[in-house]
């Protein structure tokens, strides 16, 4: 299986039914092409936005929980200590867009791409995003 870093925006989009995020997770559930990985802090980020997600989502609490469980079962959380050695390189590449440094450092460590809808991130490092 190929590794693919997933950012919090993709997880949120899958719950909101925006874009193709949920479809990608559903297809991967069948095809098993990717091992999705994310920094451990992604769940902290997700929880920060949970009330906003609940307001914007057209899903019931039960449906949202089901989707979140389905998505999170496919994502392996990686400890910061496993990719700390790539953080300075990621920060240098991203310059003033430091909020995504963990995702890039993880992608650099695993030599893989990033699944993200962040336009600025894509512009700064199109080779990986």
How would you name each of these model-derived features?
Residues 6-7, 37-40, 95-100, 118, ...:
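Histidine- and aromatic-rich ligand-binding microenvironments
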Residues 104, 108-129:
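Acidic, PIN/NYN-like endoribonuclease modules and their adjacent C-terminal/linker elements
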